[in-house]
Amino acid sequence: MKTDNTITLEEISLPNGKKLVCKEPLVLKIVEKGSLLVVKNSKLGIHCYEYTEKKLLNEIKEDLQILWEEYALGRIDDLSPKAIGLKEQLLTFFTEKN
């Protein structure tokens, strides 16, 4: 069963004290699969699932922190062609601010 619920992100706190700011609000559609709530965005490498919206939001934020550190801030020489594409998408959607 699908739901019309969405999660909207505008910024995420990073472990280094900086903020990951969305250039435009990122709206993610929540789909119900059994008792799980699922969010997927292939362009940004997001595929998260949890049992509550609060836990799902935390999971999305944690995933984006990892994706940002590993791919957006990663050296191009260390990334595969597919990972470079993800890096470019992340840099298109987000910026890091103090």
What are these regions (language model features)?
Residues 23-42:
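Short aromatic-glycine-(Arg/Gly/Cys) micro-motifs in beta-strand/loop hairpins
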Residues 1-25, 54, 58-98:
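Short, charged, surface-exposed hinge/linker loops at domain edges
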Residues 42-54:
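A short, exposed loop/beta-hairpin motif centered on an aromatic-Gly-Thr core
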Residues 38-40, 49, 72:
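Short acidic, gly/pro-rich beta-turn/loop elements at beta-sheet edges
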